[in-house]
Amino acid sequence: MILLVFLSLIFQLYIPPMIFLKGAAILFVPALLFYGSLAFPLPLVLVLVFLTGLWNDLLTIPRGSGHPDYVIGTSIIIYLIPAMIIHGFRPLFIKKGWAAHLVLAELAAILTPFCLLAQYAIISFERSDFFFSDVIVWRILGPGLIAMVTTPFVFLFLSSLSHLVGFRPRAEVAKLS
């Protein structure tokens, strides 16, 4: 999963933006992260969130002179909140069939713009300038609309891949000593 997240981060840098959605990007990384949040136990989810946020910042934050608008590591916190929300639905993901997986995929797609809105809010706060236009709205909501179409297919692909390699998400059992 970690390799898929890294390759997806690289891949989505080269996907052209959607012109008819005013330059909205196609984002696969949140779908991979949210699937991992459903399939893995909490310690692995935290590692996945940390690496996803760190790699996202390292690949997307411009390194220039002057005061940075966005500090490396901020995306870790931004991804942590929706990942923990999704992780709360893990028992439903484990016990139910494909219909629950589809609903959870759409919930993950709805949470995708949250990450972009949080990034925009942090940058605007650092710059002390809250400029809002239709282009900005589309660049925040557009990836969510795209994710509503792509995330179920990403979940289906990852479910098939997990069955192929023999990984079955199981409920965590607490051991009493």
Residue spans for each PLM region:
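Terminal, non-globular segments
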Residues: 1-177
